[in-house]
């Protein structure tokens, strides 16, 4: 029978459980899934805002927003659209009931345990689809999941917790490359936003000059083809710096330094077409963006809390 079995509300930055449903089975499979809950709660900051972990007979789904994650355990054949609609209802009610100040300053586990009453009522409704009053909104949720499906977490990304190691850890090499692409960076600073805008500006300037160079070449004005290549390489380098500033990738810092080197080489080649102030601007912006990429690192690992 497809149904929701339990749900939890957890603070993302440190995995502190804020509330949870209290009626759960004591079967071996359920106890194993609760161990997966613990492992996930420690690493929520490293995952995207909508994820699914398949554990065999059960699925763990969660969404994260405003520093709080909403997790649920359901049977493997429970519809995805209902699962994430259920989590969306929990999120809306929790945000309405508790302000961010309370959730950010909470120090005691399960300090919002009274929220369990709403979890239980909502769980009962979603376990009986005939009683659902949200059928109108399910089409919107279904379209959202289709356009932006939840990230499927490989077992090996969980690592180990309290002596329990995932049976799939030995096959983690390939999945590790996937997880790095979804790892979250620290929040953007004002200087980081300025660097992003300046890099886009430099890329746009290079692109415009590149098209003008193509126009001159077509008019047979003797424009060097290598100048066109240099302008477009400079554009690509600036855009890639923007990408590195926003997203986490493996060897991110090395890539940023190599990209900055390409920017310097392009501007050296374009020395005859730009004055010193233009060259100084492009190189300085490239160096500034490289520094911001280096400063904005991946979020650290959260400490343990029992869920």
From Swiss-Prot:
Cellular compartments annotated: Endoplasmic reticulum membrane
Domain of life: Eukaryota
Lumenal side: 209-226, 272-274
Modified residues (Phosphoserine): 6, 8
GO biological process: endoplasmic reticulum to Golgi vesicle-mediated transport; protein transport
Keyword Transmembrane helix: yes
Modified residues (N-acetylserine): 2
GO cellular component annotations of the record: endoplasmic reticulum membrane
Keyword Membrane attached: yes
Record topology, Cytoplasmic segments: 2-187, 248-253, 296-307
One Pfam family here: Longin
Domain Longin per the UniProt entry, residue ranges: 8-119
PROSITE patterns: LONGIN
Regions crossing the membrane: 188-208, 227-247, 254-271, 275-295
Keyword list, A-Z: Acetylation, Coiled coil, Endoplasmic reticulum, ER-Golgi transport, Membrane, Phosphoprotein, Protein transport, Transmembrane, Transmembrane helix, Transport
Similarity comment text for this entry: Belongs to the synaptobrevin family.
Protein role: May be involved in vesicle transport between the ER and the Golgi complex.
Name listed for the protein in its UniProt record: Vesicle-trafficking protein SEC22a
Taxonomy of the source species: Eukaryota, Metazoa, Chordata, Craniata, Vertebrata
Gene: Sec22a
């Amino acid at each position: 029978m497809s149904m929701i079995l339990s749900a939890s509300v957890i603070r993302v930055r440190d995995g502190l459980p804020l509330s949870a449903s209290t009626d759960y089975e004591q079967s071996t499979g359920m106890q194993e899934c609760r161990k997966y809950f613990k492992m996930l709660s420690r690493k929520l900051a490293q995952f995207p805002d909508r994820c699914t972990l398949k554990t065999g007979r059960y699925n763990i789904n969660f969404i994260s927003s405003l520093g709080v994650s909403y997790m649920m355990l359901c049977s493997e054949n429970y519809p995805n659209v209902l699962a994430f609609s259920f989590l969306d209802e929990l999120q809306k009610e929790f945000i309405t009931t508790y302000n961010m100040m309370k959730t950010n300053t909470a120090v005691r586990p399960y300090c919002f345990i009274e929220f369990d009453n709403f979890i239980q009522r909502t769980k009962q409704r979603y376990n009986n689809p005939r009683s659902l009053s949200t059928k109108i909104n399910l089409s919107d949720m279904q379209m959202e999941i289709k356009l932006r499906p939840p990230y499927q977490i490989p077992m090996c990304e969980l690592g180990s917790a309290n002596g329990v190691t995932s049976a799939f850890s030995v096959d983690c090499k390939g999945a590790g490359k996937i997880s790095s692409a979804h790892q979250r960076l620290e929040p953007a600073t004002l200087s980081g936003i300025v660097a992003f805008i300046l890099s886009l500006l430099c890329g746009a300037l290079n692109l415009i000059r590149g098209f003008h160079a193509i126009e001159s070449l077509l008019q047979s004005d003797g424009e060097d083809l290598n100048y066109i290549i240099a302008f477009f390489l400079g554009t690509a380098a600036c855009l890639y710096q923007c990408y590195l500033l926003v997203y986490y990738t493996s060897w991110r810092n090395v890539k940023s330094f190599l990209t900055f080197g390409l920017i310097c080489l392009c501007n050296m080649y374009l020395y005859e077409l730009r004055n010193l102030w233009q060259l100084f601007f492009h190189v300085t912006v490239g160096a500034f963006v490289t520094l911001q990429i280096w400063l904005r690192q991946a979020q650290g690992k959260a400490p343990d809390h029992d869920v």
